[in-house]
Regions:
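A beta-strand signature from Gram-negative outer-membrane beta-barrel systems
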Residues: 31, 83-86, 116, 130-175, ...
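Transmembrane beta-barrel strands of outer-membrane/channel proteins
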Residues: 46, 170-176, 219-221
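N-terminal periplasmic "start-of-domain" segments of outer-membrane beta-barrel proteins
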Residues: 43-70, 104-107, 114-116, 187
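Extracytoplasmic beta-strand/coil segments of soluble accessory domains associated
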Residues: 68-118, 150-160
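Outer-membrane beta-barrel translocator domains and adjoining extracellular loop/strand segments
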Residues: 180-187
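Extracellular loop and loop/strand-boundary signature of outer-membrane beta-barrel proteins
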Residues: 16, 66, 120-123, 188-192
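Periplasm-facing N-terminal accessory domains of Gram-negative outer-membrane beta-barrel systems
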Residues: 1-63, 129
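Short sequence motifs at beta-strands and strand-loop junctions characteristic
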Residues: 72, 147-149, 194-199
């Protein structure tokens, strides 16, 4: 959330607050200054529009609150991006996704602004821990030419950062195989064993200052 202050000699000072910017988004603020012969400050609380009428791209933004409470599995960051409209996993265990029918090798994966897409397969090389993610943007269609060399989607992931106070958390995620449904009957198994999926994952995060107001750290395991 940002604020903008405009001031000029002979005019009233005007401040607009509550301007919220999502990852990859832009906001426009029209500030009008009136003539003034005395000191005066006008504060206007405003928010950027939910629908951006200046672009045709199909974008989905997930903030930290959504990432923390999303009703999805939390074993890889693909569990988050696959929740975006038009995006689906190529397989149940793959490190690649499809967007509106595009091929899996036509996407781009960005982590804190760095391209970590495998050049040959189009997969994501590192898998960011879901609890270390601050914000996610999925450009399903109409990604701007800034990215280039792609016909699919852009998955932009921003990780959490340290602050002036120490904070941390630890989590354990578990899905028992008894929670996985069986799609066949015993007569349809052809005497082959039926293996259900079972997942276990533990995470630990810690962040804080090395030097307050200057240098911070954040780690996730």
């Amino acid at each position: 959330i940002y604020s903008i202050t405009a001031e000029l000699s002979g005019f009233t000072t005007r401040t607009e607050t509550g301007i919220q910017l999502s990852l990859g988004g832009t906001a426009q603020a029209n500030v009008q200054l009136s003539l003034s012969t005395q000191s005066e400050t006008i504060v206007v609380v405003a928010e950027s529009p939910i629908v951006d009428s200046t672009t045709t791209q199909v974008a989905t933004n997930y903030n930290r609150e959504w990432v923390e409470n999303a009703p999805v599995r939390r074993f890889t960051f693909f569990d988050l991006i696959n929740a975006a409209p038009g995006v689906s996993p190529s397989t149940s265990t793959s490190s690649r996704s499809q967007s509106f029918g595009s091929a899996t090798n036509e996407n781009m994966y960005l982590l804190d602004g760095t391209d970590f897409t495998a050049p040959l397969t189009g997969a994501a090389w590192p898998w960011p821990n879901t609890d270390a993610i601050e914000e996610v943007q999925v450009l399903s269609l109409g990604a701007p030419a800034d990215y280039g060399n792609l016909a699919g989607a852009v998955f932009n992931v921003v990780t959490r950062q340290g602050t002036n106070t120490f904070h941390g958390d630890a989590n354990f995620y578990f899905q028992n195989q008894s929670l996985t449904g069986r799609n066949t009957t015993a007569d349809q198994d052809d005497d082959l064993p039926y293996n259900r999926d079972e997942f276990k994952d533990a995470t630990f995060q810690l962040g804080g200052p090395f030097m307050r107001d200057k240098f911070w750290f954040f780690g996730s395991f």
